[in-house]
């Protein structure tokens, strides 16, 4: 076993200039991640220097067998915390051989919105709070829970410590450090209200980079849970009953909101979000109706409301933002399995480009 460990941790830079690039893409469900690796002749400093590639889309539910080739375009890369050295993780989006984005490629549409001059001028910042649940592999039941049973009621677990309150911290901390190593702008972690559930935050990130970083962080997390023999779940309500669901609260601000007088801009943006509530809900993740019930720190899925420091609202404004008259707001509606390209670009489109 020690030899296997030594080989896994082998530092290639001692023997060769070649590097390994792990190409990562979103699979046919729109939430699953796939990847495969190839050897490059040497280190690269920009995605444009990476060779294009393709994969069998018929095996991922993204193309028919008689025309199965799906093409990658390389968009962003990060340092590889698993292979280390000059090796990299590459975030790709996906196209037909004719150059058309395939249906699961939501990055393409998001990039159009984020490149719009009115959006570029406002420098949109995002901070995404990604909640997730760790499950025991063989029984698909939360980590630390008795099989077929339940722990004590919620209360002691949020940001809790101790062997009877926090399960999976080694995975969480490994992920935190791996993301920092990779160059992802991960800004924190914490234990969540339901035991076995955790959260990491990415941001502030500008525009399309928020989606790239969240997907890269999700990939790293699932690779770590694979090593640990634990299952990663992004189900927005993994356990029915008196247990919190899992969301991806999305914090947002524009240049105008961050400047003096920005609170009035924030209120106008929230009003526009309310007018398009149904459209946003439809795009904010599968199964969200099981989570947005009006209980467990959520607003009812059919109701739009906002408030200061109100975690039962659709949109929460912080006390500091109200006091200072500028800042940001939090959209609490997105589910944990949301596509960050969809959510971030839709918020920008509604608040900056859409005319009621």
UniProtKB/Swiss-Prot annotation:
GO cellular component: cytoplasm
Tissue spec. comment: Found at highest levels in root nodules.
UniProt EC number: 6.3.1.2
Residue ranges of every copy of the GS beta-grasp domain listed in the record: 19-99
Main location group: cytoplasm
Location relative to the cell: Cytoplasm
Pfam families hit by this protein: Gln-synt_C
Family: Belongs to the glutamine synthetase family.
More details: Irreversibly inhibited by the herbicide L-phosphinothricin (PPT).
Subunit organization: Homooctamer.
Identification of the protein by name: Glutamine synthetase
Organism whose genome encodes this protein: Alnus glutinosa (European alder)
Gene it is expressed from: GLN1
């Amino acid at each position: 076993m020690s030899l296997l460990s030594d080989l896994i941790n082998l530092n290639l830079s001692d023997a060769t200039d070649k590097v390994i690039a792990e190409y990562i893409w979103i699979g046919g469900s729109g939430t699953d991640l796939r990847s495969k690796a190839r050897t490059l002749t040497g280190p690269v400093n920009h995605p444009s220097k990476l060779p294009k590639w393709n994969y069998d889309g018929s095996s991922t539910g993204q193309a028919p067998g008689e025309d199965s080739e799906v093409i990658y375009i390389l968009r962003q890369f990060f340092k590889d915390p698993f292979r280390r050295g000059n090796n990299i993780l590459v975030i790709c989006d996906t196209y037909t051989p004719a150059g058309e984005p395939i249906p699961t490629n939501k990055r393409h549409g998001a990039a159009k919105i984020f490149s719009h001059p009115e959006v570029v001028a406002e420098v949109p910042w995002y901070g995404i709070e990604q909640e997730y649940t760790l499950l025991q592999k063989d029984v698909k039941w939360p980590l630390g829970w008795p099989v077929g049973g339940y722990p004590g009621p919620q209360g002691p677990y949020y940001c809790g410590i101790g062997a009877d309150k926090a399960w999976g911290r080694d995975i969480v901390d490994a992920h935190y450090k791996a993301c920092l190593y990779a160059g992802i702008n991960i800004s924190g972690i914490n234990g969540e209200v339901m035991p076995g559930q955790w959260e990491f935050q990415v941001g502030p990130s500008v525009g399309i980079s928020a989606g790239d970083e969240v997907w890269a962080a999700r990939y790293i997390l699932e690779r770590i849970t694979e090593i640990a023999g634990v299952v990663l779940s992004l189900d927005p309500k993994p356990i029915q009953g008196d247990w919190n669901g899992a969301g991806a609260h999305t914090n947002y601000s524009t240049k105008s909101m961050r400047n003096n007088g920005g609170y009035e801009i924030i209120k106008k943006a929230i009003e526009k979000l309310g007018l398009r509530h149904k459209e946003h809900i439809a795009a904010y993740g599968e199964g969200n109706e099981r989570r947005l019930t009006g209980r467990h720190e959520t607003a009812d899925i059919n109701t739009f409301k906002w408030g200061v420091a109100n975690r039962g609202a659709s949109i929460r404004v912080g006390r500091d933002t109200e006091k200072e008259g500028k800042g940001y707001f939090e959209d609490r509606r997105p589910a944990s399995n949301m596509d960050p390209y969809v959510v971030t670009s839709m918020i920008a489109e509604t608040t900056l480009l859409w005319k009621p």
